[in-house]
A protein has these predicted regions:
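A conserved mid-protein helix/loop that constitutes part of the nucleotide-sugar donor-binding site
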Residues: 52, 251, 281-282
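A short loop-to-beta-strand scaffold at the N-terminal edge of the catalytic core in hydrolase folds
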Residues: 26-34
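Catalytic histidine-centered segment of alpha/beta-hydrolase-like enzymes
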Residues: 271-280, 284
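Alpha-helical elements of the RecA-like P-loop NTPase motor core of helicases
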Residues: 52-55, 209, 285
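Conserved HGGG/HGGXW glycine-rich cap/lid loop of the alpha/beta-hydrolase fold
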Residues: 33-77
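Conserved alpha/beta-hydrolase "nucleophile elbow" surrounding the catalytic nucleophile
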Residues: 47, 111-113
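Flexible "cap/lid" subdomain of the alpha/beta-hydrolase fold that forms the substrate-access gate
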Residues: 2-10, 14-21, 30, 68, ...
């Protein structure tokens, strides 16, 4: 287990996330951030971002709810997890262990991007831990990963692929390209947050190795098999989908709304995939209304 300490830009977390601590789980350790009181909301990020993704959403929720965010080993984390399974089922297991260790369940589970796949798996495996679920634009069905990002799987398998990827992410101009973060958000991501997303894989080999294993585990069989369980999850589901998403089609929101027994769609205007970056207030309003039973 290794904690990054070589570059302060890679370890920065926004204070708006709340109190930080290291949570020791059976499968490994990760950082959690806790703010507010009331019914718990657990916010799950996706690939090559971290808890900072929710930095503008948490303050909007924490006046009425307990908001917990975590750094999953998606490549922008600080504690490496060399012995921990980090394929989608393994990541879902970490979320399940977090809910149990923090006594959060049943929780409102919120996922974005590939974090949405993790949430789908948690809901399928342990519905008793999930009171309701919010899926923002995310992978589903055969769209895992989106074709634009298929090169990431190749980078994880060819010699020096991860080193080249990590070196490229040091440069903000590269991050702004469509094949990086460029088309994931409409707004330019705050430099401090962007550095915290991109630099961990660049400065620490152990984090890079974790990301390699995550990328190798991206497989449509996980989303296909999970989709077969949607009909069995009878808790409320909100699909807070971005209207301007370039990777996750609106048709998938409609399909998921039909496949989950108690699901509805709420469109987030003006947002691309990373709606917590583009439209945090609108997303937070939708989550609050849904969690309070008004949506």
């Amino acid at each position: 287990m290794t904690t990054i300490s070589t570059d302060i830009r890679a370890v920065w977390r926004d204070s708006s996330l709340g109190t930080e601590r290291e949570l020791r789980l059976p499968s490994g350790s990760l950082h959690v951030f806790d703010r507010g009181s009331g019914d718990p909301i657990l916010l799950i990020h996706g690939l090559v971002v971290n808890a900072n993704l929710w930095r503008a959403v948490v303050p909007e929720l924490a006046h009425a709810f307990r908001c917990v965010t975590i750094d999953l080993p998606f490549g922008s984390h600080r504690i490496s997890m060399p012995g921990t399974p980090v394929d989608p089922p393994g990541l879902a297991g970490l979320v399940i262990e977090t809910i149990e260790a923090m006594d959060l369940g049943p929780v409102t589970l919120v996922g974005n991007d590939s974090g949405g796949v993790v949430c789908q798996l948690v809901a399928a495996r342990r519905p008793d831990l999930v009171a309701r679920m919010v899926l923002t634009s995310c992978d589903a069905y055969d769209n895992f990963p989106p074709k634009t990002f298929a090169y990431l799987k190749l980078a994880a398998r060819v010699p020096a692929g991860m080193a080249i990827l990590a070196a490229a992410l040091r440069f903000p101009a590269i991050r702004a390209l469509p094949i990086a973060y460029g088309w994931l958000s409409r707004v330019r991501i705050d430099r401090r947050a962007s550095d915290s997303y991109a630099l961990p894989v660049a400065v620490t080999r152990d984090i890079r190795d974790d990301l390699r294993r995550v990328l190798r585990g991206l497989d449509k069989r996980h989303t296909r098999s999970t989709a077969e369980t949607f009909a069995d999850f009878d808790r409320p589901v909100l699909l807070a989908w971005s209207e301007d998403d370039r990777f996750f089609p609106t048709q998938h929101a409609h399909r998921m709304a039909a496949d989950y027994p108690d699901a509805r769609i709420h469109w987030i205007p003006g947002a691309r995939t990373l709606s917590p970056e583009d439209e945090p207030a609108a997303l937070a309003d939708a989550i609050v209304a849904f969690a309070a039973g008004a949506e």
